């Protein structure tokens, strides 16, 4: 179940606010400039769909984002527990970083924990199937895919080169709860 938990960035032990309610989550995230919404598809993707199948199922929604925001490229990332790079990628994604562009992700299946460091608070957003999140450019954040990741996501980019991170060097991510599934 999707969820939002908000902490102070000085106290990882006591959540200040928490909700599983979609409208409340959207309201809190919109207040800090984060887009959060649900997408639907009427296509059955089947087990382990390839990237072309995933893109085709959501092409209309992708086209709307491109028209609205001018994004230039998109791709599909799939991660499974047997991926030999999962530990390396998890370590990289868990390091607090920013991007020079919005980080736009749509969860086709599975789940991931986006953690945003904004205005003295940590916003932990558990995104699941059909959740779209767009983190504004320059927002310090990290992503936890869990120890045994199992997800497929569409990534949308301003920059045709794809995912380019600027690591902050802050170890704050180590202090906050991780994704447990």
Curated annotation (Swiss-Prot):
Swiss-Prot/TrEMBL site (May play a role in transmitting local conformational changes) positions: 102
Residues that hold Fe(2+) according to the record: 97, 99, 103, 141
Q: Which reaction does it catalyse?
A: 1,2-dihydroxy-5-(methylsulfanyl)pent-1-en-3-one + O2 = 3-(methylsulfanyl)propanoate + CO + formate + 2 H(+); 1,2-dihydroxy-5-(methylsulfanyl)pent-1-en-3-one + O2 = 4-methylsulfanyl-2-oxobutanoate + formate + 2 H(+)
Family classification: Belongs to the acireductone dioxygenase (ARD) family.
- Any GO BP: L-methionine salvage from methylthioadenosine
Name of this protein: Acireductone dioxygenase
Alphabetized, the UniProt keywords read: Amino-acid biosynthesis, Dioxygenase, Iron, Metal-binding, Methionine biosynthesis, Nickel, Oxidoreductase
Any GO molecular function = iron ion binding
| InterPro entries per record | ARD, ARD_bac, RmlC-like_jellyroll, RmlC_Cupin_sf
Question: Which is one Pfam family of this protein?
Answer: ARD
The positions annotated as site (May play a role in metal incorporation in vivo) read: 96
Write down the position(s) of the site called Important to generate the dianion. 105
Residues annotated to bind Ni(2+):
97, 99, 103, 141
Q: How is the cofactor bound?
A: Binds 1 Fe(2+) cation per monomer.
Cofactors (names): Fe(2+); Ni(2+)
